């Protein structure tokens, strides 16, 4: 797979240098190797994981550019935070994962990739005491559930940034969440994905 061609088309703002490209590829390798014994992804090859998951996370680079002190809820195999932490090595990321085996992988990845800007918490999100500027999540839960977590972890200026798919599903989840329009600002941004319909939902 031509990783360079994928990454070169990701962002107009962020330059992904060779060291960061190598770390992204190494991360994919770590995931697939760990997945042989512990199920952390449905991807079968490094190429599939890179194309379907890492590249997808990086589609929102421009959106995360202005945010810091980020917590990833239900991080799983490290998505979206590990790819983001590789690119934004000056930003702090907290990876929240309640399952021990997955949290063990996140610590392994942190060590192998030399990511001093991430912290792994093996804890239920509702038990977290700290506040965060940015709360994000990908393929973890619906908007209603994540909004409850957001309300517990947010400050007055915090934002909830969610990776989501089809607009119809997003609208359905927003309706089910019964969000008070006068209480929250909701922004939906379409991501430039060639293969599937992808959006970012920003709630503040």
From Swiss-Prot:
Belongs to the methyltransferase superfamily. RNA methyltransferase RsmG family. It is found in: Cytoplasm. Pfam families: GidB (PF02527). S-adenosyl-L-methionine binds at residues 74, 79, 125-126, 138. InterPro entries: rRNA_ssu_MeTfrase_G, SAM-dependent_MTases_sf. This is Ribosomal RNA small subunit methyltransferase G. Specifically methylates the N7 position of a guanine in 16S rRNA. One of its GO terms (cellular component) is cytosol. The keyword Methyltransferase applies. Keywords: Cytoplasm, Methyltransferase, rRNA processing, S-adenosyl-L-methionine, Transferase. One of its GO terms (molecular function) is rRNA (guanine-N7-)-methyltransferase activity. Disulfide bonds: none annotated. Its EC number is 2.1.1.-. The keyword RNA-binding does not apply. The lineage of its organism: Bacteria, Pseudomonadati, Spirochaetota, Spirochaetia, Brachyspirales.
């Amino acid at each position: 797979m031509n990783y360079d061609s994928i990454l070169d088309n990701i962002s107009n703002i962020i330059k992904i240098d060779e060291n960061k490209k190598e770390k992204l590829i190494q991360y994919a390798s770590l995931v697939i190797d760990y997945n042989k014994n512990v199920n952390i992804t449905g991807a079968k090859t490094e190429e599939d994981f890179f194309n379907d998951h890492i590249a997808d996370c990086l589609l929102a680079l421009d959106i995360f550019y202005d945010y810091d002190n980020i917590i990833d809820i239900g991080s799983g195999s490290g998505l979206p935070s590990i790819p983001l932490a590789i690119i934004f090595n000056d930003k702090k990321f907290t990876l929240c994962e309640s399952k021990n085996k997955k949290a063990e992988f996140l610590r392994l990845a942190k060590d192998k990739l030399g990511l001093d800007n991430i912290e792994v918490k093996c804890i239920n999100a509702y038990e977290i005491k700290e506040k965060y500027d940015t709360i994000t999540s990908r393929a973890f839960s619906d908007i209603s559930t994540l909004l409850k977590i957001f309300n517990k972890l947010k400050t007055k200026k915090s934002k909830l940034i969610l990776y989501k798919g089809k607009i119809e599903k997003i609208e359905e989840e927003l309706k089910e969440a019964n969000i008070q329009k006068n209480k929250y600002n909701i922004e939906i941004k379409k991501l430039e994905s060639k293969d599937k319909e992808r959006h970012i939902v920003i709630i503040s």
